[in-house]
Amino acid sequence: MNAMMETSELPAVFDGVKLAAVAAVLYVIVRCLNLKSPTAPPDLYFQDSGLSRFLLKSCPLLTKEYIPPLIWGKSGHIQTALYGKMGRVRSPHPYGHRKFITMSDGATSTFDLFEPLAEHCVGDDITMVICPGIANHSEKQYIRTFVDYAQKNGYRCAVLNHLGALPNIELTSPRMFTYGCTWEFGAMVNYIKKTYPLTQLVVVGFSLGGNIVCKYLGETQANQEKVLCCVSVCQGYSALRAQETFMQWDQCRRFYNFLMADNMKKIILSHRQALFGDHVKKPQSLEDTDLSRLYTATSLMQIDDNVMRKFHGYNSLKEYYEEESCMRYLHRIYVPLMLVNAADDPLVHESLLAIPKSLSEKRENVMFVLPLHGGHLGFFEGSVLFPEPLTWMDKLVVEYANAICQWERNKSQCSDTELVEADLE
């Protein structure tokens, strides 16, 4: 009898275990996918001014909820992973022309030029000069998607291909792109200004590209001539401050660091003959490079210390990060500047966001936009599971650029009216 009672109780025990297991799995899913996180408009940091009030009226995306895909879109890790593996879905293939520029040290810089597919909303000739993320180029899907959308909104687009990033373009000097070198971007901008003397510029940088474009604008006042505005998306602002956070396992940053370092190693080693070959006349700083340390490197900091800083002769990693970061130059930018980050970006530690917040509190030309979700260069939109081809980020950058163009047009018309009234008097 006791045996029969024990046997009858077993299914109830198993049912309880199953229920607990299901509950545990659901809890993990809810936590990992961040399903309880609300959707909301992005947090905005700015000074009250005529420009900021105009932007709030002209850019609905600044005040509307950003709604990511329901099931996975609130996870910064999944957004980042999808950007990293897919780039974008159903990405278009814009048609452009590749341009080559020989730099003073013999390096061959390339960029791709895409003509507008429609008239711009203000009727002017406007060129977006675009700097992609680390080791990226014009053929990356997120760049193709953004360029296609910008073209359809009347923008000419020039996209820098980072030195050494294109697999089919050989290096012609012992140097490749670094965290903050602005030489190639500056050469592209000068080409555009010379070739299209009537054009005005909208400067756009993604991730590492955001650091480069902000540093470029702040290096000298002349670099801001003909520039209407600048947009930086998902950059970290200070490599010196970021290096410690990149070695932490919080938000899996150490894992992302390893993956990016592995990709950088592959790129560097694919150019080993051009960079380190015996026949190459290279700077003294590269002579003592120990490639065995490169092979065993597991972080970007190790690669930067062993290889990248030596391209420009920096004596230490600290000096390299201090000099190459845009943080020292942000206060010298006087054109309208929009800085965009996602609160759940696993690559950019929240402590780094104090930099754009502080800047926006001091400068009327700066607006810092911080949505809850989006990951690192993700910002996918969609109803439940499948993302849309166009992202919230693509729309926001073009919407902001359109608003600035209209703002400048309004200022110009007001000035013309004042001149006419003065003449009549």
From Swiss-Prot:
Active-site residues, as the UniProt record annotates them: S207, D345, H376
Record has Protein transport as a keyword: no
Cytoplasmic compartment residues: 1-9
Membrane topology annotation: Single-pass type II membrane protein
Glycosites: N136, N410
Coiled coil feature spans: none
TM region positions: 10-30
Side of membrane Extracellular, spans: 31-425
Domain AB hydrolase-1: 128-382
PROSITE patterns reported in the protein's UniProt record: UPF0017 (PS01133)
Reaction it catalyzes: Hydrolyzes glycerol monoesters of long-chain fatty acids; an acetyl ester + H2O = an aliphatic alcohol + acetate + H(+); a triacylglycerol + H2O = a diacylglycerol + a fatty acid + H(+); 2-(5Z,8Z,11Z,14Z-eicosatetraenoyl)-glycerol + H2O = glycerol + (5Z,8Z,11Z,14Z)-eicosatetraenoate + H(+)
Activity regulation information from UniProt: Acylglycerol lipase activity is activated upon binding to progesterone.
Annotated EC: 3.1.1.23, 3.1.1.6, 3.1.1.79
UniProt keyword annotation of Cell membrane present: yes
UniProt-annotated location(s): Cell membrane
UniProt-recorded Gene Ontology molecular function terms: acetylesterase activity; diacylglycerol lipase activity; hormone binding; monoacylglycerol lipase activity; nuclear steroid receptor activity; triacylglycerol lipase activity
PANTHER family assigned to the protein according to its UniProt record, in alphabetical order: ABHYDROLASE DOMAIN-CONTAINING PROTEIN, MONOACYLGLYCEROL LIPASE ABHD2
Family as reported in the entry's similarity comment: Belongs to the AB hydrolase superfamily. AB hydrolase 4 family.
Function comment: Progesterone-dependent acylglycerol lipase that catalyzes hydrolysis of endocannabinoid arachidonoylglycerol (AG) from cell membrane. Acts as a progesterone receptor: progesterone-binding activates the acylglycerol lipase activity, mediating degradation of 1-arachidonoylglycerol (1AG) and 2-arachidonoylglycerol (2AG) to glycerol and arachidonic acid (AA). Also displays an ester hydrolase activity against acetyl ester, butanoate ester and hexadecanoate ester.
This protein's name: Monoacylglycerol lipase ABHD2
Taxonomic path: Eukaryota, Metazoa, Chordata, Craniata, Vertebrata
Gene: ABHD2
